Design a protein with these regions (language model features):
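Conserved Class I S-adenosyl-L-methionine
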Residues: 22-27
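A short, flexible beta-alpha/helix-coil linker loop
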Residues: 6-10, 60-61, 96-99
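Terminal low-complexity segments of carbohydrate-biosynthetic enzymes
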Residues: 103-175
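Active-site donor/metal-binding and catalytic loop motifs
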Residues: 89-110
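Active-site phosphate/pyrophosphate-handling residues
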Residues: 20, 58, 74-78
Length: 175
């Protein structure tokens, strides 16, 4: 089972990496390289980056578990590769949970959300490459443009979600 809890703290939305990186990246990948069972599987999770998992003992030897920030998507990738999607679920753990927040770290890509984002992207791209997808310079160029458009579209949706739920939302900060 994969844990889930809402990412709302201090009257604003959290979960920036999932909202602003993973979900628009998956959308952009589908538009750029086409739909796949893997991308559909990843989209099926409300929050694919929650690190709380529980496993049956016999499952663990079948999983290659990474030691970087790509661990959550890596574990999901391994579950999708080795087991039927019907063998995993996502469970609401709490109404709220205060987890460790990372700094944005724009100037240092070895720290914080920059490092986390790089590790997550590498994990997803490697998984797709092992399935026979190739990523040329042109593919990455197209992916980048498609990702940016997808992220901007989602920001509009998040703005509406925040407004409907009485949460603060800073569009400039999100972009």
């Amino acid at each position: 089972c994969k844990g889930y809890y809402p990412r709302v703290a201090h009257n604003k939305m959290g979960g920036r990496v999932a909202r602003l990186l993973v979900f628009p990246l998956i959308t952009a990948l589908e538009k750029t390289i086409g739909k796949s069972d893997y991308l559909e599987f990843m989209k099926s999770f409300k929050y694919p980056l929650a690190g709380e998992f529980s496993f049956r003992r016999n499952v663990l030897p079948e999983l290659r578990i990474s030691s970087d920030w790509g661990i959550e998507v890596g574990v999901l990738s391994e579950m999708q590769r080795n087991f039927s999607p019907h063998n995993i679920c996502q469970v609401d753990l709490a109404d709220s949970y205060d987890h460790k927040h990372q700094e944005l770290s724009i100037k240092d890509d070895t720290k914080g959300l920059s490092r986390m984002s790089i590790d997550i992207i590498k994990t997803i791209i490697r998984k797709l490459a092992t399935q026979g997808n190739s990523f040329s310079t042109e593919t990455f160029r197209s992916l980048k443009a498609t990702y940016y458009r997808s992220a901007l579209d989602l920001i509009d949706i998040y703005r509406s979600d925040a407004q409907m739920n009485g949460l603060k939302f800073d569009s400039h900060n999100e972009e």
